[in-house]
Regions:
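Short alpha-helical segments enriched in small residues
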Residues: 8, 17-176
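Sec-dependent signal peptide recognition
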Residues: 2-7
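RNase H-like, Mg2+-dependent phosphodiesterase core
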Residues: 13
């Protein structure tokens, strides 16, 4: 019984230090490699930037965060092609990729992360329901994008999309 209590206490202490959050791993990888990051967020509204800048030492790698909520800001600030927004929609793989590449280029960063999605409660459709989120990471070698369904509650969607984006960046940094 005592051994079980010690194990539970150790687990509780470990969990409370947030050692398992993906942003901690990304923070360490970018800092150790002296590489930089910029983010472009639509549906996550700055949540990704907030998660990184909340950590001491983020200024070593975090260059900027752009909340490009409107289609116009995606085009003007990030260089997203308005024709692609019209053709595929703001919530699309093409737009997410261009956002990530655009923020990476504009900031001169090694990595660019972007999210675009439908956080709800309205705005969804049969093709793109509430909770649909495209996430992209632009690296020095390539740009990768994933589609995620992040639930139906606005707060949950923002939290999950942010976590998925940071996880995708971590995977790219790890070479996966």
């Amino acid at each position: 019984m005592n051994k079980l209590l010690v194990m539970l206490a150790a687990l509780s202490l470990t969990a409370s230090c947030n050692c398992f959050k993906p942003e901690k791993r990304v923070h360490r990888l970018l800092t150790d490699r002296t590489q930089t990051l910029a983010v472009a967020e639509s549906c996550t509204g700055g949540s990704i930037a907030a998660r990184f800048t909340a950590m001491p030492g983020a200024s070593a790698y975090f260059l900027c965060g752009v909340v490009s909520y409107s289609n116009e800001s995606k085009a003007e600030l990030l260089g997203v092609d308005p024709a692609d927004i019209a053709r595929y929609g703001a919530v699309s793989e093409q737009v997410a990729r261009q956002m990530a590449e655009g923020v990476r280029r504009a900031a001169g960063a090694d990595y660019g992360v972007a999210t675009t999605g439908i956080a709800g409660p309205s705005g969804g459709s049969a093709e793109k329901p509430v909770g649909t989120v495209w996430i992209a990471v632009a690296t020095p070698r390539e740009t990768v994008a994933i589609l995620k369904q992040c639930g139906t509650d606005r707060g949950q969607i923002i939290d999950r999309a942010s976590a998925f984006a940071i996880g995708l960046l971590r995977d790219c940094l790890n070479g996966n």
